[in-house]
Amino acid sequence: MEEAGLCGLRRKADMLCNSESHDILQHQDSNCSATSNKHLLEDEEGSDFITKNRSWVSPVHCTQESRKELPEQEVAPPSGQQALQCNRNKEKVLGKEVLLLMQALNTLLTPEEKLAAVCKKYADLGNSPLL
């Protein structure tokens, strides 16, 4: 009986990991200086991220993909203005992560499920290149 409960917790906690927000985080981090990215979150503000496509994007895949786009150019460290814009984008993305977490927590019933989901999300964000 306990095993079935744990599987249910794990399944609901995995819901947070498989949201589209992880894709946005990876995309924002790999293309931090691109001007088109600042409109990405603004376009999606009215939509419900939890019920949308829940595909997992590997961090390794995103990193390799962004490097393939500029094979001959060296990636220079961001200038002061680019670093400022990058930090703003990261703050927006993390704010969106908080919103997603709150929406997901509202769908869970018990405090145990909510705690498991928060722990899972914290671990995922700890592995994120944004932090």
Swiss-Prot record:
Protein origin, superkingdom: Eukaryota
GO molecular function, one term: syntaxin binding
PANTHER family: GAMMA-TAXILIN (PTHR16127:SF14), TAXILIN (PTHR16127)
Family stated for the protein in its record: Belongs to the taxilin family.
Protein name: Putative gamma-taxilin 2
Organism of derivation: Pan troglodytes
